[in-house]
Amino acid sequence: MEESQGYLELYKSRQHDFLYPLIFQEYIYVLAHDHGLNRSILLENLGSDNKFSSLIVKRLITRMYQQNRLIISANDSNRNPSLGHNKDLYSQIISEGFAVIVEIPFPLRLVSSLERKEIVKSHNLRSIHSVFPFLEDKFLHLNYVSDILIPHPIHLEILVQTLRYWVKDASSLHLLRFFLYEYRNWNSLINPKKSIFVFSKRNQRLFLFLYNSHVYEYESVFVFLRTQSSHLRSTSSGALLERIYFYGKIKHLVEVFANDFQAILWLFKDTFVHYVRYQGKSILASKGTPLLMNKWKYYLVNFWQCNFYVWSQPVRIYINQLSNHSLYFLGYISSVGLNPSVVRNQMLENSFIIDNAIKKFDIIVPIIPLIGSLAKAKFCNVLGHPISKPARADSSDSDIIDRFVRICKNLSHYHSGSSKKKSLYRIKYILRLSCARTLARKHKSPVRAFLKRLGSELLEEFLTEEEQVLSLIVPASSTSRRLYRGRIWYLDIICINDLANHE
């Protein structure tokens, strides 16, 4: 009966965007626990039945509103040791709960919009690899690219204000605002100027949600301006935009430029503008001129400062020519180069030599940062020489091999779109030899003798699925190597590999 009541509350919240009752539902915090919350925090009695309980959450929220909310009494500490030693108890529990709760309306609204417009959902669009075919298709026809460092908001309150356009529940927003205000006071004693950065590190899930919601709001200007300039409505992006207060922001923008908005709109009539965001950076590419790119730069700076109260400077936006610049993001180095080709043309008695230069989009694996990640994880030294992993020497042989093979296959899977596989082969060699050194250290035998005794079994373990399939269907002396050099994009990768993330 209690479970049915919980689902009933969730259904009501879906209908009315009323999230406050969900704060006191136990299954919300069980779900938050599954995303990394420490298990001992949400235990009502550590010595009895170990049940998750929202009673602690209710007490914590009540204590937040009390005058002595920042003081945890000695009696509470004695009754429940898990409440006494953790200074960030309020932050950890409530932020994890909020992170789950405030995310509820967004996928529901998106799904309902897609169903209403009869748009077929595609989970493959979530894949990181889906970005690269887009870049490969579009960037060949563009001239300039801007590397943008996205500014952070100067106050946490700005992040809450963004949610007002989506969440209509004033009680939840008030509690979230009060929580962020108290969190800033708690950390102001230590570092008053960097409270938002401290919050982002200790409450990553909630901060990333608030930050992405905020960035998403001022990113929508690209779709809006493009729609206004081309006079075409995009049905695919209509479900993703909330334009309730945008025209009010335009009026404010008019005061800044002291000009009519339609008079400056011609600056942005560029149908070849493409925008990609990744982590804290973004890319704005265009077929226009350097003058147009500079106008975009100063427009973005003024737009961020005047409408979203984030401080930015033009020097945070770097404009480069695509033919002379490499893009480094998502674990790849991407560049647009020229692939020369010579064609001999025969016309009657005359022959001509025609030189053609075809643009080619190259995507390669950055070997030096990747070796740095492997060295930091103790797979090799800073020069790329494989070393043993002493921490894994106590495990069984099968566990050691499985761990190294899993890391190798994950990296190969993620970097399968590389144009040049030589760097990837070196990474595989480092992991394979590091695995052999770890096993040899465990068995106290020389590496060469251990590899000789093991034979080709260890090498076969490190073969990826693509290599295994090609070895079966294509003879080794044929074009298998040429086939494997081709780029392969997977549409099931939804997060950046930890070793591939060098940011």
From Swiss-Prot:
Record Pfam families: Intron_maturas2, MatK_N
One biological process term in Gene Ontology: tRNA processing
Name this polypeptide is given: Maturase K
UniProt subcellular location: Plastid, Chloroplast
GO molecular function, one term: RNA binding
Family: Belongs to the intron maturase 2 family. MatK subfamily.
Source organism per UniProt: Liquidambar styraciflua
Keyword Cell membrane: no
Annotated function: Usually encoded in the trnK tRNA gene intron. Probably assists in splicing its own and other chloroplast group II introns.
Gene of this entry: matK
Keyword terms: Chloroplast, mRNA processing, Plastid, RNA-binding, tRNA processing
Family annotation (InterPro entries): Domain_X, Maturase_MatK, Maturase_MatK_N
Domain of life: Eukaryota
GO cellular component terms, semicolon-separated: chloroplast
